[in-house]
A protein has these predicted regions:
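Membrane-embedded alpha-helical bundles of multi-pass transporters/translocases
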Residues: 1-22, 27, 34-136, 140-204
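Short, charged juxtamembrane terminal tails flanking transmembrane helices
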Residues: 206-210
Length: 210
């Protein structure tokens, strides 16, 4: 589970790295400054949390409760959808690497820039994924950890988050050197592989929690 968390935060926290660069370089910011997009995630957290908790509660009352390991796997899939959307969009637009794009004439850059709705869709998927993974994952670790190791396991969760953040520098390297769709495709693959690993452990993890 901690390994999954590393790759989730490595992908999710690109919102402060390559996704912010994408907002600066490839999105028309004439109406909205790139830094404003940092507020979209907190906004979605506030709006979507009650809705998602209501859905979980509804399923539980119907006897169809989704286990926490399955929720984490679903969260990785949803995060993958965000990068799938970006990869397909960037491929359809024919975006080159960021370094190549910034070398184009200004008029050509402006004509190719995306509308702000692209970021809205991306952050929506990433925020939903965060709500499936971040609070539920920490709760799961606290639940399955031996009482004598509870503090250690919670610390390992935070260490996994920190390690994911330490890997963030890889995103800008790909963003600047590769066609943009390839950059997003790497994060898509990371999310889908993590989902597959989690699904492979689901039954075992569900037995552990019973």
């Amino acid at each position: 589970v901690l390994g999954i968390v590393i790759f989730f935060w490595f992908s999710f926290h690109q919102n402060g790295m390559s996704l912010s660069f994408f907002a600066r370089d490839f999105v028309d910011s004439s109406a909205v400054a790139p830094e404003v997009w940092q507020a979209i995630n907190p906004f979605f957290v506030i709006v979507l949390t009650p809705m998602i908790m209501a859905i979980f509660g509804f399923l539980a009352r119907r006897g169809r409760e989704i286990s926490t390991p399955r929720k984490i796997a679903i969260g990785m899939f949803i995060a993958g959808l965000a990068f799938l959307f970006l990869a397909v969009f960037s491929m359809m637009k024919g975006y080159p690497s960021a370094d190549t794009f910034k070398g184009l004439p200004i008029a050509e850059q402006m004509a190719a820039k995306a509308h702000w709705w692209v970021l809205i869709v991306t952050y929506f998927f990433l925020t939903v994924a965060e709500l499936f993974i971040s609070p539920l994952g920490l709760s799961f670790v606290s639940k399955v950890a031996p009482k004598s190791m509870l503090g250690l396991c919670q610390g390992l969760w935070l260490a996994a988050t920190a390690l994911g953040n330490l890997l963030l520098w890889i995103g800008p390297l790909m963003y600047n050197a590769w066609p943009i769709w390839q950059c997003w495709s790497v994060f898509l693959i990371v999310c889908l592989v993590s989902m597959g690993v989690m699904l492979g452990m689901v039954k075992w993890l569900e037995r552990v929690t019973k």
